[in-house]
From Swiss-Prot:
It is found in: Cytoplasm. Gene3D superfamilies: CofD-like domains (3.40.50.10680). This is Putative gluconeogenesis factor. Keywords: Cytoplasm. Residues 1-21 are annotated as: Disordered. HAMAP family: Gluconeogen_factor. Residues 1-15 have a biased composition (Basic residues). Belongs to the gluconeogenesis factor family. GO terms for cellular component: cytoplasm. It comes from the Bacteria.
């Protein structure tokens, strides 16, 4: 099949799915909740109807076998009874009335019996969940058929993106940096030789079904206690799990299973990575937390060891990916640490799937002062000899005046889109409003739902 025919087929499938969704919405609007539930059970792809039919066939065969076993007498009696009943009904009512009436009655009993059976089961499986079992099944099937998405990054930007993406696919692999050496993660790294769990903790919380409660629990920091003060519960939980399972990779996988996480969260490497940066004024700064505090323009960034070994599961996920997303997050301390791993660079460069970089909305003091969009792309190009992106997603409209004023006081400004310089790099530009403002704090962040919607729309058009 040619590329144009393939795109036409994809377009036709998208239109069909859209029409199916619209029909479903119309049915939902004009039917009662109970009838609407029955319609949902008839939806394709649930793997329920086929087993109901097989059960009915099996039950019929059981009665037939029993009848044969007892020398066919029951079949004769049943046939005679059915014949007399049908004769009575056709004498009482015309066949074009009695036939559909009995058919409808039979269907009613089938649906009623099955719905009560499922209801009894769901009361046990989901005693405190208001969501219908059929809705859970529909969502499960839809998400499991979603695209295989690999997201590379770290920090709050990555967890923000995952909150939106998890509504489009359950086949998400988040590749997370392990270069953090500040705060609770840094203490665990120094005192216990533990790889920093902070970013992994945030991503697991973002992908969980009970996201709000789990995030609050994982973010909870102990305020007192020898050795506990300043540590977050999530970091200690992951540390304990790593002690039990043997390493951070197995700890992340185990936590994901325990907490019903959609997708996987993997550390980029299990090596003890330490970042370093060479500033334009000649200074050499070592340590992830020290780089932004150096308050200078970064000329070059690297890590020790020079060539960390990538996790095999990470390389496998990139190879199997349908879609690769880089960012958002701190350019030098959250995104590039992953791309400094040679095997990850090579795997992304070889990928023949759509690859997009999400540019930050604002510049970051100490890391990307006065950076344009093309400067972000140049920084990525400097750590890799091959192209790692096909497009860049840029916020369309600037923040409001109060937000700009607040950020300007911190020496932070909107990232300027130097369109021509980006085009000269052979990079496509995706402009969209993916930002949200906090009216109280005047902070800007990527909006999880808008961001995910724009990214999946762009992917669908490739």
């Amino acid at each position: 099949m040619s590329h144009s025919r393939f795109k036409s087929a994809k377009s036709a499938m998208r239109k069909l799915k859209t029409e199916q969704r619209k029909f479903g919405d119309r049915v939902s609007q004009h039917t009662s909740p109970r009838v609407n539930r029955w319609f949902k059970w008839m939806a394709p792809g649930l793997f329920v109807k086929r087993w109901m039919v097989i059960s009915a066939v099996g039950l019929t065969l059981m009665f037939l076998g029993l009848a044969i076993w007892v020398k066919l007498t029951p079949i004769f009696r049943i046939t005679e009874f059915v014949s007399d009943t049908l004769g009575f009904l056709t004498n009482l009512l015309p066949n074009y009335v009695s036939g559909p009436l009995i058919l409808a009655l039979g269907l009613f009993f089938v649906f009623w019996g099955q719905s009560r059976t499922v209801g009894s089961i769901s009361e046990v499986l989901q005693p405190d969940n208001d969501q219908e079992l059929v809705d859970v099944l529909l969502a499960h099937r839809r998400l499991n058929k979603g695209a295989k998405i690999v997201v590379v990054g770290g920090g709050t930007g990555l967890s923000t993106l995952l909150r939106g993406l998890k509504h489009y696919s359950a086949n998400i692999t988040a590749i997370v940096t392990v270069a953090d050496d500040g705060g609770s993660s840094g203490r665990l790294r120094r005192e216990m030789g533990m790889l920093p769990p902070g970013d992994i903790r945030n991503c697991i919380g973002a992908l969980a079904d009970e996201e709000k409660l789990l995030t609050e629990l994982f973010q909870y920091r102990f305020k007192a206690g020898d050795g506990l003060s300043g540590h977050s519960f999530g970091n200690l939980f992951l540390t304990a799990m790593a002690e039990i399972t043997g390493d951070l990779e197995m700890a992340a996988i185990a936590c994901s299973k325990v907490l019903a996480v959609r997708g996987k969260v993997l550390p980029a490497t299990l090596d003890d990575v330490k970042l370093w940066a060479e500033m334009e004024d000649g200074r050499y700064v070592e340590g992830e937390s020290n780089i932004p505090e150096a308050q200078g323009r970064i000329r070059r960034i690297g890590c020790l060891p020079e060539s960390p070994k990538a996790l095999p599961a990470v390389l496998k996920a990139i190879k199997a990916a349908d879609y690769i997303i880089i960012g958002p997050g701190s350019l030098y301390t959250s995104i590039l640490p992953n791309l400094l791993i040679p095997e990850i660079q090579t795997a992304i460069a070889k990928a023949k799937v759509p690859r997009i970089y999400i540019c930050n909305v604002m510049t970051q003091p100490g890391e990307t002062d006065n950076y344009t969009v093309s400067d972000h792309l140049t920084a990525i190009d400097q750590v890799s000899s091959a192209r790692l992106y096909d497009a860049v997603l840029v916020q369309r409209n600037p923040p409001s005046a109060p937000v700009l004023k607040k950020y300007a006081a911190e020496n932070s400004h909107p990232v300027y889109l130097d369109r021509q310089a980006v085009i000269e790099k052979g990079c496509r530009i995706v402009l969209a409003n993916v930002m949200q403002e906090d009216e109280k704090s005047h902070q800007v962040r990527h909006d999880p739902q808008r961001l995910a919607r724009v990214l999946m729309r762009w992917y669908g058009g490739q």
